[in-house]
Every structure is written in structure tokens, then in C-alpha cells.
Amino acid sequence: MMSGEHTLKAVRGSFIDVTRTIDNPEEIASALRFIEDGLLLIKQGKVEWFGEWENGKHQIPDTIRVRDYRGKLIVPGFVDTHIHYPQSEMVGAYGEQLLEWLNKHTFPTERRYEDLEYAREMSAFFIKQLLRNGTTTALVFGTVHPQSVDALFEAASHINMRMIAGKVMMDRNAPDYLLDTAESSYHQSKELIERWHKNGRLLYAITPRFAPTSSPEQMAMAQRLKEEYPDTWVHTHLCENKDEIAWVKSLYPDHDGYLDVYHQYGLTGKNCVFAHCVHLEEKEWDRLSETKSSIAFCPTSNLYLGSGLFNLKKAWQKKVKVGMGTDIGAGTTFNMLQTLNEAYKVLQLQGYRLSAYEAFYLATLGGAKSLGLDDLIGNFLPGKEADFVVMEPTATPLQQLRYDNSVSLVDKLFVMMTLGDDRSIYRTYVDGRLVYERN
């Protein structure tokens, strides 16, 4: 495993970050920090010093070459709080809503990950896609096959990437070729936790796909894992689609709704992340808030599968932590800028105006907070892990034109969010090292 070199590194350019986590969007502007000519000093993969170039340049030894990115914009690495790596090859599958889509497209694709060599090949592709889109941390679904998770963690470990992932637990209501059992899912997950959790920057998430595909016996095994390894994460889906919710209620009639299934099995709380949450009942909003659970907002996926519109305003009101998720492969892009672009539209339809600052927060420090990692990543505070992206605000002729006609910082950020894509990502750094550069 590689880690950041011991020698000092110096990066110069324009920087933007949010210096503290917040409880309502009105606070973001006061927490935002923009340094037009800044200096980032990195040592052993961590932020050693950050501030104005003039205040820090005397700290740079003569032997150190400064990486000069003036004219670009340097931001903390993007955080993707919900994505399926074994669905990369089926992005853009036509014409279905959630339950039909799973059976027709997802399950046959995930079957291929039984082959370790195939899983390794796709893990390498997946991580390259994350990096070329500026994503440096992700919460990731594997498949039911433990080797799918081994392959992903192996690939992430080569660049010492901050990643949380887990093996899908699924013992019913899916094709026989993809089912495990309550017992086997427990033992396989336990082995993966022992092998990978807190190995370098890797972390493990207990990952029941969603309540309909886990029997009560398997949910009890997920609970047992969480009790035995309380510092692991939990990653699953919740209230994405109305038919799904009705199905859960029919399968678990003794529970008080969908979220209550997870709650009664001890799968709510800090570091428990629920993707989608488009159709929550009031009591479910309250429970997510009370338990300090988190939501992954996945706009491109919710639009693509016709699932519905996520209510971000309500999440702020209820003080529920939210991060952004691309949700590849129901989501249609690895790119966080495009994901924020779609989030803006989802919220416009509800009369809520997502500012560029708020969007930027959700994709960086807010996402880190939703994953319980805000003490490690998300901004440029000294001691934080040095994951960051050098962005090109004028990557296309249209972006150049629009940038030239933008006056304020918030306007320039908003233009990047609406017109930007993978061409906007000039360089990506993980653990203080360059891991992607645009040709």
C-alpha cells in the first residue's frame, strides 16, 4: 500500500472550501473560505499548512518545486455517498422503474462479479472513473460475492483512497444465482470486516441491499454484525419508490413502516446511510433525525427511474444529515458537477433554490459529515487528509464565454455546476499525490 511521501509538497492557486459543518444553509456563506492566491503545504498525505501565498511562501524549502495552478480553482475532493460499482456497465439501461429495472438489468449484470478477475477489471475501471470526475471518497455497494469487495478494496488500496464498501446481503426475492443465506452473509461479511475495515483508509459498510431482499433472519445477522463491530458503517436503500414501500409493508406487516424495519434491527444511527428517502413519512423523518442517521440524495437516479423528488428543505428543517450520491447505474453520471446540476432542477420543481455554495457544501464537507468523516476530509484544515481537485472553470468554449460574463464567485461556481462535467476536472489528488491528470 502506498501513502503520501514524507517530503513536503507545495501547491499554489485559488482555493475554496467550507471551514465548518453547518446546521442550516443560511450559515454556509459565513463558513465559506476563498483564497485567490493560496498555498497548500502537504506532508505525509495530510494538510501541513494552508493560507495566503504571501503568508506561507517562506516555509517552502528551495529544493521543493511548487505546483502552480493559478488560473484554476482548487477544491476539496468530492464525496459520493451512494454508488454501485458493479452497475457501471449498465448505466443508461432503458425504460423501467425500480423493481422491474432490478430484475431486468441489475441482477444479470451483478452475476458477472462472481469472477474475481472480472471484478478486478471493473474495479480498476470504476476507480479511474471516480478520479477523472474528481471524486476522492465514496460509499460503495459491491455485489453478493465477497470477491467483488476484495477486488474493489485491493484497487483502492493501491492509491490509499478513502473508501467505504461492503458485500451485499441478499437471501430472498432475487434470482437464485445471486442469493446468499443469513448464515453465509454473516460469515462472509465478518471475514471482509476483519480483512479490510480500517486497513489504511478503507472502511467497511454492512450492506443489506434493501429490506425486501433480506429475510428477518438475515436482518438479525446484520444487527449481530453491527453489534460486534460497532465502528462499521451501514449502507442500504430506503423509500425510493412507492411500489417498493408497499412491498416492504407486506413483507414486514408487524413493523411500523419501512424505516422501522431497519430501526428494530439496530441499523439506524450515526454512520448509517440511507439512499434516496424520496417518500418518507413524517415519523420517518423524525426517526432519522433522532437517531442521527444520514441520507444520500441521488437526483439523477431519482429522475431516471421516475422515483420522485427528494425534499432537501425538509431534511434541513429536521436536521437530518445529507450527502450527494451519483447512484451509478440508475444514476447516469459519475460526475458530481452534473449531479448537482440535476439536484438544482429537482429542487426547483419544489420551489427550493439550491445555491452554488450549498451545493458545493453538500458535495464536500457536507458529504463528509453525512459519512461521519468530517474530522478527516472535506476541507483544507491542517491535519485533514490531502484529497483535492484542481478544476478548470473554462474547459469548453461555452464555459469560457459564460465565465467571462460572470462577476461574483457564487455565479462562477454556479456556472461550473451547471455547465461543468469531467472536462472540468484538470487534476485529482488523493493522499497528497497526483492520481489523475486530464490529457
UniProtKB/Swiss-Prot annotation:
Keywords of the record: Hydrolase, Metal-binding, Zinc
Residues annotated as binding substrate: 84-87, 209-210, 237-240, 327
Binding site for Zn(2+): 82, 84, 237, 327
CDD domains listed in its UniProt record: GDEase (cd01303)
InterPro entries reported in the protein's UniProt record: Amidohydro-rel, Guanine_deaminase, Metal-dep_hydrolase_composite, Metal_Hydrolase, Metallo-dep_hydrolases
Known cofactor(s): Zn(2+)
GO biological process: guanine catabolic process; guanine metabolic process
GO molecular function: ammeline aminohydrolase activity; guanine deaminase activity; zinc ion binding
Enzyme class: hydrolase
Cofactor note text: Binds 1 zinc ion per subunit.
EC number: 3.5.4.3
UniProt GO cellular component terms: cytosol
Catalysed reaction equations from the record: guanine + H2O + H(+) = xanthine + NH4(+)
Gene3D superfamilies (alphabetical): Metal-dependent hydrolases, Urease, subunit C, domain 1
Pathway: Purine metabolism; guanine degradation; xanthine from guanine: step 1/1
Family: Belongs to the metallo-dependent hydrolases superfamily. ATZ/TRZ family.
Function of the protein: Catalyzes the hydrolytic deamination of guanine, producing xanthine and ammonia.
Protein name as annotated: Guanine deaminase
Organism from which the protein derives: Escherichia coli (strain K12)
Lineage: Bacteria, Pseudomonadati, Pseudomonadota, Gammaproteobacteria, Enterobacterales
Gene: guaD
